[in-house]
Structure formats: C-alpha cells, structure tokens
Regions:
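Sequence-level preference for short, compositionally simple segments enriched
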Residues: 30-350
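Extracellular low-complexity, O-glycosylation-prone stalks/linkers
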Residues: 379-392
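Short beta-strand segments within Ig-like beta-sandwich modules, predominantly Fibronectin type-III
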Residues: 394-399
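Surface-exposed, short loops/turns at beta-strand junctions within beta-sandwich domains
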Residues: 406-413
Length: 452
C-alpha cells in the first residue's frame, strides 16, 4: 500500500540522520516515544497534529516529506486545529484530509494586490497554492480561509485556493472554502483543467467561484458577500469547456448577482435553488471580452428562486450545443468522458460519500439501477440501509461499494444510507434520496442520470 511505503521511506530517512525521535525543524517535531501517531486502523500515510501527537506539527513539512511521486494517492490526515500557515503543493496524487470539516482549519491572510507588489506572479498569493502541473489533488473534510478582509479591511481579490498551468483532476469534497474577498477558489488551467466539487460550501466576494476549463459542482452551497457576481467561468480555449452546477443552493447579501463573464464562458445550472436575496439580473458580460468566439452561454433546468421566479432562468437546455437532456448531465458528461471522478476517486473521507444516483436524483430507472458510492478511508465493509421511509431500514452488509436493490416501484421516492464499518466501530453516513421514473415520477424536468 502507498501509505506503508511512505512511512518506510520517512522512517528510514529519520533514522539515517539521527532524528528518532528528535525534532525536524522545530515546530515540525515528530511524536514523542510512546505516543502513537497512527491508530491501528488508520490508513493515512502521514498525520499532522499541532499538539505534537502526529508525524508533523505543520502541513508544509508533511507535504515536503512525501516522495516526489507515487502510483497512488498519498493521504495526509490533519488533526483538528487551526493551522495558520500558507501551503505549497508541488506533488501530484496527494489528498489533504481534515479530521473534521469545521474544526480543521487552514487560515492565512494575503491580498493579491499586495503580494504582486513584490512578486512577479501569484505563486504564494493563496492559502493553498497548487503548483503548475499538479494532478489528482484532493482537498477534503476541512476549512480553508483567506481572512485578509476581516483583518486588513479590503475585500479585493484574495485567494483561498489557486492553481495554474497544467493542473487537473482537482477535487474538493465536503469542505468549506472561504475568502473575505474575491476569487476565493481559482483553479486556473484554462487549457486542460478538470475540477470536481461535491458537498462543499464556497463564500466570498466578486467572482468567488471562478474556474477556467471544465468544472463540475454538486450538492453544494454558495454565499456571495458582494453584489457584483458569485460565479465566473473562462471557457475561452475550447468550445466544450463548461461550468456545471447541479443540486446546489445560492444565497448572499440582498441584491447579489448570480454570475458574469469577461471572456467566453459556458454555464449549466440544474436543480439549483436561489434565495430571495438574488437580484433579477441574468448572467452578464462585465466588459468587452478579451476573447469572444462563442458568446455568453447560460443554460438552466428546473431552477427555482424563493418567492418570485425570474424568466431568465427558465428551462432552456434545448438551446445548448447538442441539446443535452437533463438525465445525461453529470460529472462524466461534463468532462467529455476523460474523467469520471464519481467512479474513481480514492477513499479519503471517514464516511461513505458521492452517491450514485446522486442525492435528489429524479427519473432513476426502476429496472436495472444499482446504488454505488465512494468508500470510507477505514472501512472494511458497509451497512446499507434502503427503503421508502426516512430513516431507511438496514437491508445488507456488503464488502464493496455497490448494492443491487432489485426492481423498484416507478414514481416512488427512495431513501438510502451507507454506514462505514471500521475496526473502531460504525461511521454513520448521510441519508440520500432519489425518485424513480414512471407514472408519478415522470421523466421531465429535474431528470437525473442514475448510473454516472
């Protein structure tokens, strides 16, 4: 396993230089004798803990300790605490995973304009800086916050996460990504970047969610603290590039605008809800674009606003290139089949995640549908609960990450939950739901593909 090899290399290095169990770089001290950094069932490669109970006290030293590359994902587990540090990720196939989404916090203060006064580029302007060429990065179960605005007063551009050229297959799972200014999460490989986000929360000011390339978001929350725009997209290098947001919620200060572009961009919003605070302002062109070959493209399906609806987010998928049906649109479709994160992401979270059918899916086939999920990090088996009631009853214990429910009743709402069975006990999952197609469920607005 990858984590065992990493530990062997690390242990060998420390023994060779006489640092067992002495300190490495002061604050990056190894654990004292008799204090286990890893529980017997822990599958993380390295553990970071501010109190000294892990392999390292700082995230950066753990990142630096990893070998340059590996065939599989290296998991760095961050114990609960506030890590006030700026981190630099230059290695591929890495997962930074918090112990608890709200209690594991990476925080730094940096205003982009101040950084650029003394630096030639943005490398170092973010809390989490992702180096050029990094692939297969996972940020999960933690909070990342650039708090410059609350400390320094300006709400201008301040990155929480930024990546650049050649970065791709970056996933944000069950995380809070916050900035007290604009450009909160800036994944900026405009040539080939592919980014996946699930069950996360994003906050900031202008253009706080602003991917370049291909980006997919599901079951997430957006909160805009400014009125200019929440989402932005750069799809200027390939007509197929798109930002797809599904089953997500938008909120913000009174009069917040949904989105804008300053160059070619393409938006798909399906099964999204907007608070009554959203302004009656369609996604708009902010200025004369730097490039504008395909125009502003914004497509909606079954989106609703609290209170009055606005005509500009009426269903119009039929106007998109190829006239895709709602049930076709998922992560794999977004990435044109080049990446299927909902089938291939590593098991890094402490609980089962990323359900297929997705949470809230409609028109799921009553015949031939299977349930699948991404596994939990420590799980050896899973207790599957499934039925027409919430909470659903337990129906099976399985060793894999799929369950065949058999024929389903058309037009019916089903609930399901997957609890991870670990050596330390059971980790309760979330309750998910879907509706089968048929006489009552139908196959119209809100339809969602059942099997990726």
């Amino acid at each position: 396993m990858v984590h065992l090899e990493t530990r062997r290399r690390l242990a060998g290095l420390l023994f060779a230089v006489g640092l067992v169990p002495a300190c490495v770089g002061g604050r990056g001290a190894l654990v004292s004798p008799g204090v286990p950094a890893h529980g017997p069932d822990e599958r993380a490669d390295l553990v970071v803990a501010r109190d000294g109970s892990g392999d390292f006290r700082t995230i950066q030293e753990a990142l630096d300790a990893l070998p340059p590359d590996a065939p599989g994902t290296r998991i760095i587990l961050l114990r609960n605490g506030t890590y006030r540090e700026k981190i630099f990720i230059t290695k591929s196939r890495v997962a930074l995973v918090g112990e608890d989404r709200d209690r594991t916090r990476i925080i730094s203060s940096e205003l982009r304009s101040e950084w650029r006064r003394t630096h030639p580029d943005d490398w170092g302007a973010a809390v989490v800086n992702v180096g050029d060429g990094v692939e297969d990065l996972v940020l999960a179960n933690l909070t990342i916050h650039n708090d410059y605005g609350s400390r320094g007063g300006s709400h201008d551009h301040q990155f929480a996460v930024r990546s650049g050229k050649g970065t791709t297959r970056i996933s944000v799972l069950h995380a809070n990504v916050i900035a007290d200014g604009g450009d909160t999460i800036s994944l900026w490989n405009n040539a080939s970047g592919m980014y996946y986000h699930a069950s996360s929360s994003f906050e900031g000011y202008v253009d706080f969610f602003c991917p370049r390339g291909w980006s997919y978001v599901t079951d997430s929350r957006f909160f805009g603290h400014g009125t200019s725009a929440s989402i932005w997209h750069d799809g200027s290098t390939d007509e197929d590039q798109k930002l797809v947001i599904q089953s997500s919620r938008f909120d913000g200060v009174p009069g917040f605008a949904l989105g804008r572009i300053t160059r070619d961009g393409q938006f798909y919003l399906l099964d999204c809800t907007f608070s009554a605070a959203m302004a009656d302002r369609p996604i708009y062109l902010a200025r004369e674009p730097e490039t504008f070959r395909w125009g502003l493209r914004a497509y909606f399906w079954s989106c609703h606003r609290d209170g009055a609806e606005f005509p500009w987010f009426a269903d119009n998928l039929q106007q998109a290139n190829g006239a895709p049906r709602a049930e076709q649109i998922d992560a794999r479709w977004t990435f044109a089949g080049q990446w299927d994160p909902e089938a291939t992401l590593p098991a890094v979270l402490p609980f089962a995640s990323i359900p297929v059918p997705r949470n809230g899916a409609r028109a799921v086939p009553a015949e031939g549908s299977s349930l699948r999920w991404i596994g939990a990090r420590k799980a050896g088996a899973y207790d599957v609960r499934f039925g027409r009631t919430d909470p659903p009853p337990i129906v099976a214990r399985v060793e894999g990450t799929a369950y065949e429910p058999g024929p389903l009743v058309p037009g019916t709402t089903y609930f399901w939950r997957v609890d991870a069975v670990t050596p330390a006990g059971s980790v309760k999952g979330f309750v998910w739901r879907f509706v089968t197609g048929g006489p009552e469920g139908g196959t119209g607005s809100n339809a969602s593909k059942a099997n990726g």
